[in-house]
């Protein structure tokens, strides 16, 4: 069994099986809550809804609930595998809805291939959900099902396989034609593929301004031309008068190619006959009709888009459906109509022309993203997409008369910002950023099974280039037992490495006046931890992650000996990212400084602020205490006051204040009403604790009891990227830490001006 296959199976099976769950949104801790949540109290909202059905949006979750409905007849590239086998895909769709637009999902698999059964099933769901996303239903059934449901139901129904690609590629088409300076009403477009996505995309292009007669569509039998036998009603719409009978012939003189078919059906030679500055959308997944490098080699003047994240201009449906439904639900739209789809396309096209924030550019490798041939549409993890597409869709629903609720666009945009703050995108953005230029990361505990699995993930996902230290036979044996390949993973045994003597000499020179003898240095570099640190110091690797098999202090101590704190700092400190459903906090110092004085607290705050800023998040720092702005006279509170004074003096532009209690820091109402003089422009997202006791206890309680995902400890203040795991970390924790280390390494490289 391949490691990727096993990893996917483990991902779905570990812990609670599957990928989604139902979480209560109201307190439910005693008899009183029970009487309100259920009988007798629940009768009151029932009676209100009976009098006014619209009150269902006030008293139930209907307004934020979408059903993902499938019968499993066309599941991804797997075909007709059935409703039950397609369930993991539908759960995955639910994750995307939640992650990108905070929409709750019931995935509902219908055990019938009869379109009438699917239609009736969906119609009966109307009292339950606010919208229906049809998924993975074969053509032409999908057309009939969607048309019938849109005509008979009073909630949005949307078949993403049809319209998603149309909406996103439509934005790319508009902008590509701007770049090549061609008029949409004059271009000739050739489609490879005539399934649901191709038909819907072609129709959407016509609404954008493409002349229907200028579209040539090809299926597996060749060109769809007038008079060809066996065409269904949907293909008939695109039958044209032409002598072309093959895809190659159709491409002669074409301005645009849109591939929604299968891998490798287009060659470089076939592109030679296209018009000047051709636009090539090779959208088959995972392998396009022609690879971008091959297309550019054949036609250097071409603009190329694919469905892949490792090339420019990724046409990804996740840019559409979460935000389209968000806008539709928020105005209680009765349907998703053509005006709303068009609004989504034009919003995406316009957003791509705006200046891209540095935080988004950093997430995609640091190169400045700018509208042009390699940046036609926004990136999937650009948090601005929500703020552009959802309001555009919502307003289109209002303007076209199908909305049940009128909105103020600016107020609505503010609601969206509050619903999904940019911090929620942090980890996704970091992964994407690391993938742009994967650094090398050395793992001293190379034969640990969890380190091996994490390294396999990092290599497969293109996040980092792992280097595993240890006995090579032991590493290979562990990999074999775990059915893991070691492809693209470097193995090094410190005991036989050719540079061990050089590292021993360098270590001795660094520590000889700290009591280390030359013989001790020679012995130390045989230890994978010391050897890995020397690799990092010598520039042989970009970052180090360790601590899986040793206690935290025993991992930090060698790092301080070999690497040390960065110039100008006396202390290093540990941060935990605490990710909640709606926001992310940064806690410090959670791991290193037991009883920091005021000077050290100030240093911890500035180091944490710099780290948070590098993530693209504006730090709002609260210096915590049991006292609020001098309310208690005590040396412990005075220490925090002194740290705040130092920060105000040294970093006047930094949003930092205190001393303050924890609830004051995170509850905006308390902060603004009771302490309006505070420098924070909103609730704090960085919490600096007065000592290690408080910080360590707080993060562990919130991780175990408060539902937070804790990512860390992230070591800041080191001269080079060293990150230390908690002992016996699980594979996802190791991967998260490696992602942090990778981005840290890229930042160090950028600031050092290195071009390694």
Name each region found by the language model.
Residues 1-157, 351, 396, 403, ...:
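N-terminal ligand-binding/catalytic initiation module
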Residues 192, 208-235:
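NAD(P)-binding Rossmann-fold cofactor-contacting core
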Residues 65-77, 82, 166-170, 180-206:
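Glycine-rich adenosine-cofactor-binding loop
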Residues 84, 136-183, 404-405, 415-756:
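Anion-binding alpha/beta catalytic cores of soluble intermediary-metabolism enzymes, centered on
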Residues 160-161, 180-182, 282-390, 397-400, ...:
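Adenosine-phosphate binding glycine-rich loop
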Residues 236-303, 309-310:
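Rossmann-like adenosine-cofactor binding region
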Residues 126, 184, 250-251, 271-274, ...:
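A short, aliphatic-rich alpha-helical micro-motif
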């Amino acid at each position: 069994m391949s490691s990727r296959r096993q990893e996917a199976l483990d991902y779905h099976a570990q812990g609670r099986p599957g990928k989604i769950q139902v979480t209560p949104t109201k307190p439910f801790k005693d008899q009183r809550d029970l009487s309100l949540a259920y009988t007798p109290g629940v009768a009151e909202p029932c009676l209100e809804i009976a009098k006014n059905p619209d009150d269902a949006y006030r008293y139930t979750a209907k307004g934020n609930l979408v059903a993902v409905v499938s019968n499993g007849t066309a599941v991804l590239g797997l075909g007709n595998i059935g409703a039950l086998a397609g369930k993991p895909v539908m759960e995955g769709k639910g994750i995307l809805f939640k992650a990108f637009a905070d929409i709750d999902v019931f995935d509902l698999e219908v055990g019938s291939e009869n379109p009438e059964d699917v239609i009736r099933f969906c119609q009966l769901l109307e009292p339950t959900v606010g919208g229906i996303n049809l998924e993975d239903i074969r053509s032409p059934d999908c057309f009939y099902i969607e048309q019938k449901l849109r005509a008979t139901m009073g909630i949005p129904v949307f078949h993403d396989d049809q319209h998603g690609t149309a909406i996103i590629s439509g934005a790319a088409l508009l902008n590509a034609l701007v770049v090549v300076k061609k008029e949409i009403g004059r271009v000739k477009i050739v489609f490879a593929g005539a399934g649901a996505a191709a038909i819907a995309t072609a129709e959407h292009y016509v609404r954008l301004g493409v002349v229907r007669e200028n579209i040539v569509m090809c299926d597996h039998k060749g060109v769809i031309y007038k008079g060809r036998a066996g065409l269904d009603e949907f293909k008939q719409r695109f039958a044209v008068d032409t002598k072309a009978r093959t895809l190659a012939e159709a491409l002669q003189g074409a301005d645009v190619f849109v591939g929604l078919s299968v891998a490798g059906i287009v060659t470089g030679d076939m592109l030679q006959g296209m018009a000047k500055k051709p636009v090539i959308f090779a959208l088959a997944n995972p392998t396009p009709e022609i690879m971008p490098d091959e297309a550019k080699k054949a036609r250097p003047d071409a603009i190329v888009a694919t469905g892949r994240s490792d090339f420019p201009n990724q046409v990804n449906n996740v840019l559409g459906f979460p935000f389209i439904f968000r806008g539709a639900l928020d105005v209680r739209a009765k349907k998703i109509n053509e005006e709303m789809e068009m609004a989504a396309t034009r919003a995406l096209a316009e957003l791509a022309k705006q200046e891209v924030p540095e935080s988004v550019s950093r997430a995609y490798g640091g190169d400045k993203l700018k509208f042009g041939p390699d940046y036609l549409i926004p990136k999937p993890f650009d948090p601005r997409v929500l703020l552009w597409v959802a309001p555009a869709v919502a307003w289109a629903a209002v303007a076209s008369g199908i909305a049940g609720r009128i909105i103020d666009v600016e107020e609505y945009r503010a609601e969206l910002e509050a619903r999904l703050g940019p911090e929620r995108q942090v980890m996704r953005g970091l992964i994407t950023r690391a993938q742009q230029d994967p650094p090398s990361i050395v793992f001293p505990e190379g034969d640990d099974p969890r380190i091996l699995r994490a390294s396999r993930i990092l290599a497969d996902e293109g996040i980092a280039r792992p280097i595993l230290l240890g006995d090579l036979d032991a590493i290979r044996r562990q990999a074999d037992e775990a059915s893991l390949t070691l492809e693209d993973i470097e193995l090094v045994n410190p005991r036989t490495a050719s540079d061990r003597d050089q590292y021993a000499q360098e270590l001795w020179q660094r520590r000889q006046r700290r009591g280390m003898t030359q013989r001790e240095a020679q012995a130390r570099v045989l230890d994978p931890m010391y050897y890995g640190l020397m690799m990092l110091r010598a520039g042989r690797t970009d970052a180090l992650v360790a601590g899986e098999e040793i206690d935290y202090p025993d991992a930090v101590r060698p790092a301080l000996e070999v690497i040390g704190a960065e110039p100008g700092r006396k202390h290093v400190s540990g941060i935990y990212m605490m990710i909640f459903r709606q926001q992310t906090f940064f806690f410090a110092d959670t791991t290193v400084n037991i009883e920091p004085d005021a000077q050290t607290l100030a240093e911890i705050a500035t180091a944490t602020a710099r780290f948070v800023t590098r993530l693209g998040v504006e730090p709002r720092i609260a210096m915590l205490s049991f006292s609020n702005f001098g309310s208690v006279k005590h040396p412990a509170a005075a220490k925090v006051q002194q740290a705040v004074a130092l920060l105000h003096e040294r970093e006047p532009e930094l949003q930092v204040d205190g001393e303050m209690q924890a609830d004051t820091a995170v509850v905006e109402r308390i902060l603004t009403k009771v302490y309006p003089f505070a420098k924070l422009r909103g609730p704090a997202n960085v919490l600096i604790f007065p000592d290690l006791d408080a910080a360590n206890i707080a993060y562990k309680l919130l991780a175990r009891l408060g539902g937070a995902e804790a990512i860390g400890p992230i070591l800041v203040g080191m001269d080079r990227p060293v990150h230390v795991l908690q002992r016996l970390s699980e594979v996802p924790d190791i991967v998260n830490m490696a992602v942090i280390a990778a981005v840290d390494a890229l930042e160090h490289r950028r600031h050092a001006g290195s071009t390694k």
